[in-house]
C-alpha cells in the first residue's frame, strides 16, 4: 500500500512506484484482509501492484494444495495465469501495466511445474508492445486518492476497474485461440499449465497441429481467467459441436463457460 501512496503527499521524487507482493497459497490466505482493502483503495496512476501467488498442487513445498483462482475472484482482483517461463516474464509486464491502467491490483498465478523449470527466454525489454486501450473512466478516475469514501470503492471496482482490466486483456490478446481449424467442431478451453498439458497430450496421441486442424479441433487459451471474458468464449464457441474445459483442481473456468453459453439461441 505504501508504494501506491508515494505520490499523494506532494514530496515524492518519482512519478510513481510499482511493486510486487509474493506468497504461496497459504500466504495468500493469511493476507486476504490487507489485499482486499488495498485492491479497493487502488493503485497510483504511475504505479501498479503485481500480486504473485505460487500454487503448489502436489504440495512439494507447502501444506495445502492451493488453487488461487477462486480467491482472486472473491477479491475481485484481475488475475493472469502464465503457461511457460517466457510467459511469466511477459505476463508480469502485462500485469503491472494492467494494474496501472485499471487502478486495481493484478494477480499472477504461477505453479511449481512452471516456476521450477528451466527454459531459454527472450529478455529484450522492448519485445512486448503493450497496447493501452480506449476506455471511458469516471471524471474522478479510478486510482488511489486521499479521503476516499469507502462506500464508493466497491462500485468503482466493479463498474470501472474490472471492465478496464477486461478491455486491456482484449487489446493485448491475452485470451487467444492457439489452435485453429477451417472447419471447427471440437473446442478446448484451458488456461496456464493445463493448456500446455493439453497440447502435450495431443502430441502423445499422435495429433499434431495439422492433424488437429484437419479433425476440427480448436483451442482457446485463457491468459486472464478473471475477470472472465464471456464474449470471447461465445465467439469461440460459435458453430462448435462440443466444448471440453481442461483445468486444475476446481471448476473455475467450467462454471463460467457454462453460464456464458447457457440458453443461447
Predicted regions and their residues:
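Thiamine diphosphate
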Residues: 1-100, 111
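Flexible, low-complexity linker and terminal segments
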Residues: 82-265
